[in-house]
């Protein structure tokens, strides 16, 4: 191998190594959600998708997503909640883009394997701007059918975040999975998770 070929080979390897971070970079969305953003646009935002935040507050059946996908957030959410809801989703985007783990399972993988309904019980984490303060656990309503983590939960989380709180929004088991006081069990387990990971959550 002559000197010129060796140099070309070394340069090729260096170029490939330089491209590796870009190749493995996580796609990030923009915090540009407004009341006029459609539900499809919101759900396809790479950071909303990547965060795992649950945004299906009205759909009890998968086919209902087709009806709502081209509706705006203003049409989807209650008028008095929509502005704060949009800001909450922008917070989710910002947190995800900053490397924050937004979605936390409150049960272990072993527990979920034994009872798959436990996989739907989650916490959505909004860290405070200043760590070490108080936290609030938001339990959004309408547990008879579907829960409202984005609309009621998100809007409350945004207001509390603006007051300096670290906020957790609980997605608890509902409808057919809500028997035997399941939502109360989820609430207790959520508090346990927060308490056991207080240093990690900075609360």
Cite the ranges covered by each PLM segment.
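Serine-hydrolase catalytic-loop signature spanning alpha/beta hydrolases and amidase-signature enzymes
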Residues: 143-146, 167, 193
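N-terminal targeting or regulatory segments adjacent to alpha/beta-hydrolase or S9 domains
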Residues: 2-9, 21-117
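Short amphipathic alpha-helix adjacent to the substrate-entry channel of hydrolases
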Residues: 149-168
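Alpha/beta-hydrolase active-site loop
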Residues: 178-200
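Hydrophobic core
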Residues: 11, 15-19
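Short beta-to-alpha linker loops that shape the active-site pocket of alpha/beta-hydrolase fold enzymes
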Residues: 142, 171-175
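A short loop-to-beta-strand scaffold at the N-terminal edge of the catalytic core in hydrolase folds
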Residues: 115-127, 134-135
């Amino acid at each position: 191998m002559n000197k010129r070929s060796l140099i070309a080979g070394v340069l090729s390897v260096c170029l490939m190594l330089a491209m590796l971070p870009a190749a493995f970079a996580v796609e990030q969305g923009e915090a540009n959600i407004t009341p006029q953003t459609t539900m499809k646009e919101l759900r396809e935002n790479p950071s909303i998708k990547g965060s795992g935040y649950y945004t299906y507050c009205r759909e009890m059946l998968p086919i209902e997503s087709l009806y709502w996908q081209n509706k705006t957030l203003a049409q989807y959410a209650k008028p008095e909640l929509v502005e704060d809801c949009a800001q909450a989703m922008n917070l989710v985007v910002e947190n995800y883009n900053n490397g924050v783990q937004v979605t936390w399972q409150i049960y272990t993988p072993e527990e979920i394997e034994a009872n798959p309904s436990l996989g739907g019980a989650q916490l959505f984490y909004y860290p405070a701007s200043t760590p070490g303060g108080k936290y609030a656990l938001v339990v959004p309503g309408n547990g008879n059918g579907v829960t409202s983590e984005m609309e009621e939960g998100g809007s409350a989380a945004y207001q509390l975040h603006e007051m300096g709180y670290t906020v957790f929004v609980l997605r608890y088991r509902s409808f057919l999975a809500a028997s035997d006081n399941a939502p109360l069990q989820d609430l207790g387990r959520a508090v346990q998770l927060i308490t056991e990971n207080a240093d990690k959550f900075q609360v």
